[in-house]
């Protein structure tokens, strides 16, 4: 199974890239993690609908057919660590690859959010996109560690 993290925005600070890579390399071979960063649409005088459409096209192009889509959204379901671990286990048993999608500065296109198989949120707080990448990969690793009985997660 593969976890594909699709993130709008190609530039992140070095500290965020280093932290992301540190967690990504911890996953076992049977649970591959891949990051696909897609270009943010230049803002200028474009309408929000135009921006959403351009970023949605890039996101959809980055996600292979048959992949389960999970949109990160402030209106999504809030999960505990145990609930995310259970969700990860379900995804693994289902056998499909999963794409977790992080939107751009204005979030995700409303139609894309609605079409996603699931919508989850990481926090009630507004977070910088670089931080979301790190928080997401860390929480996925923590969920894996719960399921594997690895000592990383402590109650």
From Swiss-Prot:
Catalytic activity: pseudouridine(1915) in 23S rRNA + S-adenosyl-L-methionine = N(3)-methylpseudouridine(1915) in 23S rRNA + S-adenosyl-L-homocysteine + H(+)
The keyword Phosphoprotein is assigned to this record: no
Matches recorded under CDD domains: RlmH-like
This protein's name: Ribosomal RNA large subunit methyltransferase H
Coiled-coil ranges (or none): none
Keyword Methyltransferase among record annotations: yes
Gene transcribed to yield this protein: rlmH
Superkingdom of source: Bacteria
Gene Ontology CC annotation, any one: cytoplasm
Compartments where located: Cytoplasm
Disulfide-bonded cysteines: none
This protein's UniProt keywords: Cytoplasm, Methyltransferase, rRNA processing, S-adenosyl-L-methionine, Transferase
Family affiliation: Belongs to the RNA methyltransferase RlmH family.
Sequence positions that bind S-adenosyl-L-methionine: 72, 103, 122-127
The organism of origin for this protein: Paracidovorax citrulli (strain AAC00-1)
Enzyme's top EC category: transferase
Record-linked Pfam families: SPOUT_MTase
A GO MF term: rRNA (pseudouridine-N3-)-methyltransferase activity
Enzyme Commission code: 2.1.1.177
């Amino acid at each position: 199974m593969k976890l594909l993290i699709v993130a709008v925005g190609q530039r992140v600070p070095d500290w965020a890239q280093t932290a992301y890579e540190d967690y990504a390399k911890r996953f076992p071979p049977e649970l591959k993690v891949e990051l696909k960063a897609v270009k943010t649409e230049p803002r200028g005088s474009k309408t929000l609908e135009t921006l959403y459409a351009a970023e949605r096209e890039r996101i959809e192009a980055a996600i292979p057919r048959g992949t389960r889509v999970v949109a990160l959204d402030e209106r999504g379901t809030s999960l505990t660590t145990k609930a995310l671990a259970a969700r990860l286990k379900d995804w693994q048993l289902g056998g499909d690859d999963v794409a977790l999608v992080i939107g751009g500065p204005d979030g995700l296109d409303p139609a894309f959010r609605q079409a996603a198989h699931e919508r989850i949120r990481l926090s009630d707080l507004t977070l910088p996109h670089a931080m979301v990448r790190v928080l997401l990969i860390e929480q996925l690793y923590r969920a894996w560690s719960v399921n594997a009985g690895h000592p990383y997660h402590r109650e």
